[in-house]
Every structure is written in C-alpha cells, then in structure tokens.
Amino acid sequence: MIGQITSGLFGGHDDSKKVKGTVVMMNKNVLDFTDLASSLTGKIFDVLGQKVSFQLISSVQGDPTNGLQGKHSNPAYLENSLFTLTPLTAGSETAFGVTFDWNEEFGVPGAFIIKNMHITEFFLKSLTLEDVPNHGKVHFVCNSWVYPSLNYKSDRIFFANQPYLPSDTPELLRKYRENELLTLRGDGTGKREAWDRIYDYDIYNDLGNPDQGKENVRTTLGGSAEYPYPRRGRTGRPPTRTDPKSESRIPLILSTDIYVPRDERFGHLKMSDFLTYALKSIVQFILPELHALFDGTPNEFDSFEDVLRLYEGGIKLPQGPLFKALTAAIPLEMIRELLRTDGEGILRFPTPLVIKDSKTAWRTDEEFAREMLAGTNPVIISRLQEFPPKSKLDPEAYGNQNSTITAEHIEDKLDGLTVDEAMNNNKLFILNHHDLLIPYLRRINTTITKTYASRTLLFLQDNGSLKPLAIELSLPHPDGDQFGVTSKVYTPSDQGVESSIWQLAKAYVAVNDSGVHQLISHWLNTHAVIEPFVIATNRQLSVLHPIHKLLYPHFRDTMNINALARQILINAAGVFESTVFQSKFALEMSAVVYKDWVFPDQALPADLVKRGVAVEDSSSPHGVRLLIEDYPYAVDGLEIWSAIKSWVTDYCSFYYGSDEEILKDNELQAWWKELREVGHGDKKNEPWWPEMETPQELIDSCTTIIWIASALHAAVNFGQYPYAGYLPNRATVSRRFMPEPGTPEYEELKKNPDKAFLKTITAQLQTLLGVSLVEILSRHTTDEIYLGQRESPEWTKDKEPLAAFDRFGKKLTDIEKQIIQRNGDNILTNRSGPVNAPYTLLFPTSEGGLTGKGIPNSVSI
C-alpha cells in the first residue's frame, strides 16, 4: 500500500533520477520557530500529512495540457531539518532537505511552485538544487513570506537566479513571468490584507483624521496642481465618516499593522528596533504629565547645565502612578530602551558628537558655517550670484521680497575685497530659506512658533572655511502680504548684548534649516520621492529582469518606514508636527516645494552645479570642479557617486548594447511610463524626464535612483543625532521673537543670556521628544545591508555582473581609506571643525547602533 502511494506521488518513472536540494526558511516569529520545525519535521514521513510541497518547472520541456508552459515535476516535500544557520536571537534560519524526481527530458528547472498547507506563514529564503545532471547547481533566491495556500488566488512561484530580458526569457517561462506581474499589480480594488503582495498607488489622503474634528483635517497631497506629490502605496482602507475623500486611519496601538506588501515589511530585528520607536511616539500623549520629572521651572531648561544633564548625569524619573503604569504596560527591556534607564530610573541620552569634545565649540561662527558643508543638511547652501539677493516670489501677491542686506553690512569682513570682487572670485555664498517660508510664515506664527524667514550670507576664506557675514530675518508685513516684509539685518559680534543677539540670530537660522532639513532634504527628497520607484519596479519589472535585480536592494524597508511615518510621524498631531516649527503646515509646504522637484537634478553633479557650488569641468575627475574645495559632503559624495555610476554602467552595458534593445524591452518601457504618468504623475508633463530610449539614459536614471536611496539619504539622516541630538545646536522651534530694546525680554537677555536663549528655542518637553526621535532615526539596525553588499552572494548567475559588483565593493573600500586620510589632514579644516567631529556620514560601512557613519543600500529608517 505504502509502495503504491509512493509510486503514485513520484510518478513511477523507471528512468527518473533524484536531485537533492536544500531549502532555507524561517518562521514568522523566531520565538516559536522550534514549534514549526518540529511540526514540519516530526511528521515529514507521514505521506498524507505533509505540509509544504515544491514542484519544479522545466524551462525546456513543455506541457501540452498547460498551454505549452513549462512542465511541472512531481511534488516533493520537506525532509528532516539539516541545521540551524543563525542564533535564535538574530532570526533563526533552518535548512531542510528536499528530493526531486528528475529525468533528461525535464532539463534545467527555471522556476518552482511552492504550496504551504501549514496553518501559518514562514519566510522562504532560498532553494538550492545541488547537482542537476548536465547543469550543475541551480539556485533560487526567494526572500519571501509564504502564507497558507488558501490565502492566495494563484500559485506562489519563484524563479532561478538567471536574469533574462523579456525577449530572452525561455518560451516556457514567459507566461509564468507575465502572470506573476499581474498578481503583484492587483486590480486596484478592495482593502489589502496582511498576506497580500499587491503594489499599487494612492495619494496622501490619510494624514489627517477629520472624524476627530476640524483641527485634525489635513490637506490631501497629490492629484492636484496646487498640491502635487509623489504617490504612496495603496492600502484600500475605507474612507472616513465625515469626508469620503479622506482615508480612515488605524488606531495608534496597531500602527505596525499598517499595510505594505508582505515582503516589504521589516524583518524580525528591524521590527523589534522600530517597536521601541513606536512606543516612544506614544509618550507624546503623556508629555503634559511629565513636567514632574524636572526640578526648576516647569517645561524650561534654566541653563545649559540643565541641558547637559540629559547626557551626563541623567534625570531622575518619579516613582509615581504614571511611571508605574508605563512600566506595567511595557516589557522591561523596552522600557529600558524607551526611557534610557540604567535600572535606577534615570533618563539619559548618549552624548551627541557635537558636544563630545567641547561643550561650547558649537556656538562659534566657524562651526555654524561648517555645518552647512558637513552637518546634517549640507545640501542647501548655494553660491551668491546677485547682490542684494532677490526673491522669486510673485510681487503681485507678496510685494517686494528682495533682501535689505547692503554692502555696508558686509564689506568690512571681505578681506579687503568689494562685494563685486568677492562675487566674481566665487567667495560669497548664501543659505537662503526666505522664499520657502514667507508664504506660510504668517500662519506658522499663529501657532506656538514665533520665527522668521532667514537669509545668511557667508564668505569663503583663504583657509577654505566659511565665515558668516550677515543674517537677515524677515516677517510678513503687518499690513498684509502685498506690502512685502519687514526685515532686520544682524552682523557678527562677540561683545555684550550684541553678542547675545547674534547668537539668537544664528539660532533662528538653525530653526529654519532644521525644519527645511526634516521636511525637504530628508522626508520629501529621499523618502517620498523614492516610494513610486519601489512600487513601479515591483509592478512592471519581473524579478527575472536585470534592472529589477539591480535596483531591488535599494528599496528594502522603504515602503514600511514610509507607511509607519504616515501613521505616527508626519500625520496630524504626530511627532513631526509636535517637534518642528512648521507645525500643521509642514507637509503642505513640502507639496509646494515638490513643484520644483526635477529628477535629473537629483544627480549629485547636477545638484552641485545648480546650486552654483561647482562648475562643469571635463578635466576634473568627476566632471565638475568644486568652488569650495573643502566641502566634505560634496568631496566624499562625488567619490561615492562615481563609484555607483561605474558599477551601474558596467552592469547595464552587459545587458544593453544598443538603443534598439532599450526600446524593445516592453517591461522597461512600461516601468518608465508608469513612473512618469502615475508614480510621479503630477509631474508627468515635465520636459526634463529622460525618454528612456538609450542605454545612457538608463544608466543615468538608475545611478540617480541608487544615489537618492543610499548615499543622499545617509548624508541627511544619520547625522541627525550627532548634530541635532543637542537641541541648542539645531533647535527645531523658536517660541518668541528677537527681544527689542526696552522690553523685559531684552533686559533678561543682558542679564542672563543663556536663559534667554533657552527660553527662545525648543521647550524642555519638546526637546525630550525631539531628541528621542532623532536618536532612533540615527541608529543602524544590526541587520542593515550597506552599499556594496547584497543579502545573498548568489543574487545573479551572470558572472560578469558579479565581477563588476566585486569591483564596486573594492572601490568603496578604497573610498573609506580616502575618507580616513582626508579626516586626518589638518589643512582640511571643514572635515572636523571646532567641535572635532570628523565627517564620516558618507563612510560606506558601519556596525549597528549610533555611529554617525555607514551608507545603507536603501531608505530604511
């Protein structure tokens, strides 16, 4: 009887041979993996109760009964576990044996179907066939969650690691390739479930919560000329009760359940790390009760020593009902992380790099200027090309917005040059936040924020460092926008009350720059703009497509982090609105800025030229010559950019040798069309989009995509805690205007300038929330994958791309050595500055934690 069953299952072919394989998988919850392993292996020989089946699909032998698609092998089932690959705490992976029947006619397998008859999902990492006769090893990279088969409308299929352009796909695999893409696209209807793998687009209509009152209504971003925006992933949640155009939100406590395609969800380690961050966001709801934690004035730091106690001595937590309730609701290990306790109930943060060597160097003019080149937002500064600076705002709506800075304000600081001479010698630069803020400033200043729109002029000195010349602070005219602005110009001083006023002027600039950094440089220009590329790549490029294989690592965790951001960070009354000066207008402002977003300008050389800090120069190593030679972000960035471009050029050139091959690639053309017309659909008619008609356009576009996702994001993200973890250095909010002579505030500024400074910038409780946020965002998880690394060494079978990738990795190692060398060069004063913080944000690799270095492959935090 058993023999008959076995014969039936294996087909009973006398000429069949056995092909052994290894399956690597992990259960959904590492902690109960042992249970799954026992259930899979303990009954493996119970023929009628086997739970996971595999069927190979031939790439050479057709099945006439199946529309001439590749023939399926007989089902094979998991055998005894072979070994556990990693420790339990790191996400245990277990290898199982599997044995297939095979014959000569079947040839080389190109894909396989898996069916999960178990009651729960598991993570399938890979299948390796050890020795297919006449073909050797065949490897399938899977990295996918497989749910019980009842959850799927079609079979789960995985392809071997041999890439194919659509026209080169073996005929017997083409239908499988096409059907898999159809599955991933879905039909645009219905609410998405946890097991779904569907990628689709939607507008940002889920940031507000109109069901909770008018104060929680937020502008829909995307789908309009007034507020254009990149698209996000569709969840299919129902509309709100009060506004059918707004998508309903899920409860805060279920934030981590927000839908993204299943394989886009964080891995075990990443989710564990992010859960801690989610818990921190809950603290915002109990902040009003936390003032009992502090001595002195409630919600105020009384001195810089008060601030420093956050990092050095710590703050004693009260053993009251609030603390007990919090610790009862949260596991001990998470409360330790959440509240930075050491077992003694002490709230303490790591010392930020900017105050590690010196507690006061951050206040120097040199450091203030240096951070525009090597800080957390080194992508804004531009060369001054007209004096006085002129506004591009419509004078009909906003009146005269041109700068009131005159030559008299600055010429005594130009080392003997006139303004014209300094400009002609490329010596004058500007940090300009004026035009962005003015249209919103009147509304922003009706909130707790009281701030200005700023312009900062800087002079490039002979030693390569910048010195600030003047700061202009502007407010909308009290009589109306059409009357322009009222402005005041401040110049450097180190004497008396004028010195304190200058420190405050720099603080207002830092507030402007901090908000622009979080809103534009970070969220919009990396997180938001890359998500449509993630969606389009999965919808239009098969996993068999070489460009899918090229780009896939650079999309890891992006949809999940963005979905969580919509849920707890950038939503109405979320952490972002609670900690930045733009408050509830923040995201709407980013939509206005997106109007000027140009994809080709995101390429680093193009960006540097556009900002006037570099000029095109074919004789220079990277095709551009920097006008600020000691510009750490640009110097290191150009090295990274060139390495990425060389790698992408080698890779794409292997698959595309002519324009014709680009044009006839139907998947590639559909991908680019969808990106333009849907993913970034509000900008579909822009003339600057590459046509995707030549290999060079493909190379340039892929290089830019990888740059945005990896190095650009690293440069603007992982410096947050090193520089903004000490809030006085980069305050996120200013709460009162510059003190005027004759007022009590002015007298306080004269008598106690430090206290006046601290009463102007971010309040104590906001500081705690803000520091907690940037600490989490600046940390690398222990499972991070960095530029030049891959999750699997067998990500492709093609040898030449593997060799090119190896060269890319070696080039990045060389760049690391060059960065270390430059940081040790005392002549390059901007590399470390007065705070002695070497520039390492574009150092390719890192270990886990708060390191201030490392370029992850993707926008993953």
Swiss-Prot record:
It catalyses: (9Z,12Z)-octadecadienoate + O2 = (9S)-hydroperoxy-(10E,12Z)-octadecadienoate. Pathway: Lipid metabolism; oxylipin biosynthesis. CDD domains: PLAT_LH2. InterPro entries: LipOase (IPR000907), LipOase_C (IPR013819), LipOase_C_sf (IPR036226), LipOase_CS (IPR020834), LipOase_Fe_BS (IPR020833), LipOase_plant (IPR001246), Lipoxy_PLAT/LH2 (IPR042057), Lipoxygenase_dom_3 (IPR027433). SUPFAM superfamilies: Lipase/lipooxygenase domain (PLAT/LH2 domain), Lipoxigenase. SMART domains: LH2 (SM00308). Keywords: Cytoplasm, Dioxygenase, Fatty acid biosynthesis, Fatty acid metabolism, Iron, Lipid biosynthesis, Lipid metabolism, Metal-binding, Oxidoreductase, Oxylipin biosynthesis. Transmembrane segments: none annotated. GO terms for cellular component: cytoplasm. GO terms for molecular function: linoleate 9S-lipoxygenase activity; metal ion binding; oxidoreductase activity, acting on single donors with incorporation of molecular oxygen, incorporation of two atoms of oxygen. Residues 220-247 are annotated as: Disordered. Residues 33-160 form the PLAT domain. Binds 1 Fe cation per subunit. Iron is tightly bound. Its cofactor is Fe cation. Residues 163-861 form the Lipoxygenase domain. It is an enzyme of class 1 (oxidoreductase). It is found in: Cytoplasm. Expressed in tubers and roots. Not detected in leaves, flowers, stems, shoot tips, or axillary buds. GO terms for biological process: fatty acid biosynthetic process; lipid oxidation; oxylipin biosynthetic process. Fe cation binds at residues 522, 527, 713, 717, 861. Monomer. Belongs to the lipoxygenase family. PANTHER family: LIPOXYGENASE (PTHR11771). Plant lipoxygenases may be involved in a number of diverse aspects of plant physiology including growth and development, pest resistance, and senescence or responses to wounding. Catalyzes the hydroperoxidation of lipids containing a cis,cis-1,4-pentadiene structure. This is Probable linoleate 9S-lipoxygenase 3. It comes from Solanum tuberosum (Potato). The lineage of its organism: Eukaryota, Viridiplantae, Streptophyta, Embryophyta, Tracheophyta.
